[in-house]
Amino acid sequence: MLPSAVAAHAGAYWDVVASSSLLNFPAAPGFGNLGKSFLIENLLRAGGAPPLGLPPPQHHGSAAALGAGAQVRSLPASPVPLKLCPAAEPVSPGGAPYGTRWAFQVLSPSADGARLPGRAPGDPDCAFQPPAPAPSKPFFLSAPPFYSACCGGSCRRPASPTAFAREESVLPLLTQESTSKVRRGILRRAVFSEDQRKALEKMFQKQKYISKTDRKKLAINLGLKESQVKIWFQNRRMKWRNSKEKEVLSNRCLQEVVLQEDPLSRSALGFPSPCASLWEVSQQHPSPGWRENSPEPSERLIQGSPGAEALPPEAKSLQGALYLCSEEDARDKNALTGTV
C-alpha cells in the first residue's frame, strides 16, 4: 500500500472517531487535519467517495443524527485516559514531509499491541488498543467538546449561576438574625407618668437606698416592675451625687473669688486673720519704751555678763534675737538675769 493511501486511510479513520464516536459534534475546521487541509489527497478524498470498509464521515449535528434514527456510539462509564501525541511525519511521494498532526487517542487496558498505520513504529506513546464494549449509558451529549475530551471526561463543567444561592439572598437573613439577637438584650426606656414620678421622688427623699421589701411594695402600688423601680433609684442617686459635687465646687470657687477681691472679708467668713509682720508691729508702736527695753546686741550681752562664757549655744542664739515686749515683761526679764 502506498504511503499516501495509508495516510489518507488513517486520517479518515481518526476524523470518524473524533467527530461521531467520541464527541458526536462536528469537528472544528482544521482541528483534525491541522497542516494537511491543503494537500491534494485530502482535497480528492473530500470530493470523492471514502475508502472501502469505512462509513462516510458524519458532519451534521447531533440533533440531525438523532432525528434520522442513527445510533450514537457511547464511551465507557469509567474514566478513559486520553493522550495527546505528535504523529510521525510520513514522506509524500514527492519527497515533501507532511505536517505534524496532533490527535486524541483512546487507550484501553488491552494486551493487543497493534499500532495505527502511518505512525512511527518506535513511538511508545502512540500505541492503539481497541476500545472496550460500549455500555448502554450515553456520553455527555450536551457537554462542550473541550470539557468532554479533556482528561478523559473527568473535567467537570463550570457550575451554573443558579447552582448556589446568591449572596444578596443570604446576607439579609444573617443581618436580620444578628440584629434580632442584639435587640433582645437592649431594654426599652420606661416612660413614667406624673403620679409615678412624684411617688418615686417622695420615696427617694425619705431614703436614698430603698430596701427590697419597700421596692416590691412600691412597684405593686405604682403598677411597675421591680427592675424599673431599681433602675430609677440608681439613676436618681447618680443625679443627686452629681448635683452635690457641682454645688461644692461652685461654693469653693465663690469663696476663692471673694477672698481675692477683699482680704478683710476673711473674718466675716470665719477665717482667722493672718499674723502681722514684725515691721508692721514696729511701725504701729513707735514709743521709746519699746526701744529702751529692747535687748542690746549679743556682743555687749556676752561681754557684760559675768557668766556669759558658761552659757550654752542655745542661750546665746536666743540672746541675739530681737524681742518686742512691754515694760513689765522687760522688768521681769531683768530680774531673772540678775538672779542668774
Curated annotation (Swiss-Prot):
Keywords: DNA-binding, Homeobox, Nucleus. GO terms for cellular component: nucleus. Its main location: nucleus. The keyword Electron transport does not apply. It is found in: Nucleus. The keyword Nucleus applies. One of its GO terms (molecular function) is DNA binding. PROSITE patterns: HOMEOBOX_1, HOMEOBOX_2. Residues 283-313 are annotated as: Disordered. CDD domains: homeodomain (cd00086). It holds the Pfam family Homeodomain. It comes from the Eukaryota. One of its GO terms (biological process) is neural precursor cell proliferation. Residues 185-244 bind DNA. Belongs to the H2.0 homeobox family. PANTHER family: DBX (PTHR24331), HOMEOBOX PROTEIN DBX2 (PTHR24331:SF4). This is Homeobox protein DBX2. It comes from Bos taurus (Bovine).
